[in-house]
Design a protein with these regions (language model features):
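Short aromatic-glycine-(Arg/Gly/Cys) micro-motifs in beta-strand/loop hairpins
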Residues: 10-26
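A short, exposed loop/beta-hairpin motif centered on an aromatic-Gly-Thr core
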Residues: 27-36
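Short, charged, surface-exposed hinge/linker loops at domain edges
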Residues: 1-12, 37, 41-77
Length: 77
């Protein structure tokens, strides 16, 4: 069961060479790992550490509102 302090964040994960990079756009925090699962776990840890260290002012300044992720089609010239 989720804790009252838990919040749902977005993770955008992409492959870069031999690693995966995970980005949390709401906080502009990124991490990486050798697999998708490791990158996500490392991102979760980075966000947890940020919340432990950040003061309330930094949290307000850094935290963005809702992030919308979608796909679109474009024609290559």
């Amino acid at each position: 069961m989720a804790d009252a302090n838990d919040r749902l964040f977005t993770a955008i994960i992409e492959r870069e060479d031999d690693a995966y990079v995970a980005l949390c756009p709401e906080l502009d925090i990124a991490s990486q790992g050798g697999s998708i699962e490791e990158a996500l776990s490392n991102l979760r840890e980075a966000v947890d550490l940020f919340f432990e260290a950040a003061d309330p002012r930094e949290l307000r300044e850094r935290q963005r509102g809702h992030v919308f992720v979608t796909q679109f089609q474009a024609t290559r010239g």
